[in-house]
Amino acid sequence: MRIVIGSYVVRFPLGGYLSWVGQWLHGFARLGHEVTLVERAGWRDACFDPRTGAMGDDCAYGVATVTAFLERLGLSRFGFEDADGRTYGLTATGAFAGADLFVDMGAHGSFAEEAEQAAVRILVDGEPGYTQMKGVAADYDAYYTVGLNVGTSRSTVPTAGVEWRPIFDPVALELYAPLPPAGDAYTTVMSWQAHGRLEHDGRVYGQKDLELPKFLDLPGRVRPPLELAIAGKHVPRAELEGAGWRLRDAHAASATFDAWRDYIAGSRGELAVCKQVFVATWSGWFSDRSA
């Protein structure tokens, strides 16, 4: 089959995003399918440059990073359109020509018109709760979510009028060579506040900034060190360090796919909290990192 995947790795060319999308791309390719990655800026200042920590219109770093990453996976079909309409690689029309399947993994409907060329269009939701509360376009043939409870009586996530099917992110173990733990700490890479809080039906939902404080004193209760590679707004660094948490720069730990992979390989194990919206809604969130 000819499969087109839409995501946001040029806009956010960080190791964790590359790992997530890359494992889908790699998995489909291993099954013998022709795989194409597409992305569109969609608005001004949409591209993050991890070298400067700034958002802007210059997508050159992201394009170069993604192109090199795809080459490592043995892939070459790629197209990106910046905020001025300039195309890098394939045009959107060319990318979708003859497509059997379009998988939207964060393109946020930006290819709605071009995706009509695909025989089947599906949405894969990686942010259960946020996706449904913000509203979902009705131009997909099927809807999948890593919120395994969404659409059941166990979860309060609104269905937005569609049927949600549970799905697990693929894990390509060959991209992560087995190594003995190099470090002594349990770690995670996280954002304290990646974006603003969300209000739905009179209730406000937050992120990891509302969940991690519940475990603030955990380092004093266990023997192994606990480390947070952390970024985001309003991080209470002094409070966290005072409670015994070791802090690292999340952007440094995830600046590239190799940095991300090496940081994980050097960890004793993953210790993380979910975003508060995932917890409060009993979404059943289960990601590639959960696996």
Predicted region positions:
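Short hydrophobic beta-strand segments
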Residues: 1-12, 104, 184-196
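Extended catalytic core of nucleotide-activated donor transferases of GT-like folds
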Residues: 4-155, 253-259, 263, 279-281
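Short, basic, glycine/proline-bearing loop/turn elements
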Residues: 7-11, 82-83, 122-124, 198-202, ...
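Generic structural signal for residues positioned in beta-strands
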Residues: 2-4, 123, 142, 163, ...
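Conserved alpha-helical elements of sugar-nucleotide-dependent glycosyltransferases
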Residues: 16-27, 207-215, 285-289
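A short hydrophobic beta-strand element within the catalytic core of glycosyltransferases
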Residues: 103, 271-273
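Conserved catalytic-core segment of nucleotide-activated headgroup transferases in glycan assembly
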Residues: 154-269, 277-279, 289
